[in-house]
Amino acid sequence: MPYPPNYGGVIDVFYKIKSLHAIGIKIILHCFKYGREEQEILNSLCEAVYYYERKLNPTKLFSSKPFISITRNHPELLKNLLKDGHPILFEGLHSCFFLDNNALNQRYKMVRMHNIEWQYYKGLLKGEKSFVKKLYFNWELKKLKSYESILSKADKILTISGKDQYYYNIRFPEKTILLNCFHKNDTIRRNNETKPFCLYHGNLSVPENIQAALYIAKKIAPKVNVPIIIAGKDPSKLIVDEIKKHKNISL
């Protein structure tokens, strides 16, 4: 569900929709309801919006396909995709369950890669304390790495950074295009601030970002004289408590 746009992947999706709408591209949006409700603003930007329930069946953990993909295997999604012959943009590896479906062989298919998913899960694994969650992340990252082969069925792979572009271009030469993140800002405003400062921004409730923020607070802040701003949504209590110990950090 690409609204509200309050974290990385959703920011890119929502402002991509806005940008395409602004230049007259008609959009049929398919999205899964996963902790978010239907949003009227999407109806104003799209020709049609289809919503699907994501079924988090624990037995699907034992599938050879990644849990984040197989739980988006909805028959109505494929049925609706087959109503027309338009190009299809798959947002993220997790949305690619039907990418290799024979019924879509004649369609022009693009995949937007928001990251290297298995490497992201590797980071989650390193930052996780729970033994059960560690097992899950370790299992999933192996499946995600193998699952990348499905990208061979895409006509184009749209990467979000130079690092990702390099990685995917080695695996899928001639398919990859670097397309940087879509975001809210369409103008550059000069910063008249005379004093330098450091900014760290991210989702402050996920383990790897919590660790990064704590590292900045404990290891970097005591050694520098410039103000440090740590910004993001849902800050962990660990971050809040640590920042209180440092005069040069604000949240």
Task: Set out the residue ranges of the language-model regions.
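N-terminal subdomain of nucleotide-sugar transferases
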Residues: 1-49, 83
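Donor nucleotide-sugar binding/catalytic pocket of nucleotide-sugar-dependent glycosyltransferases
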Residues: 110, 137-188
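A short, charged, and often flexible helix/loop element on the N-terminal side
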Residues: 49-78, 129-137
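Active-site proximal beta-strand in glycosyltransferases
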Residues: 88, 104-128
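Membrane-proximal helix-turn-helix segments that form the acceptor-binding/catalytic region
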Residues: 15-18, 78-82, 117-120, 128-157
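Conserved catalytic-core segment of nucleotide-activated headgroup transferases in glycan assembly
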Residues: 12, 170, 178-247, 251
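Short N-terminal targeting/anchoring amphipathic segment
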Residues: 79-97, 108-110, 156
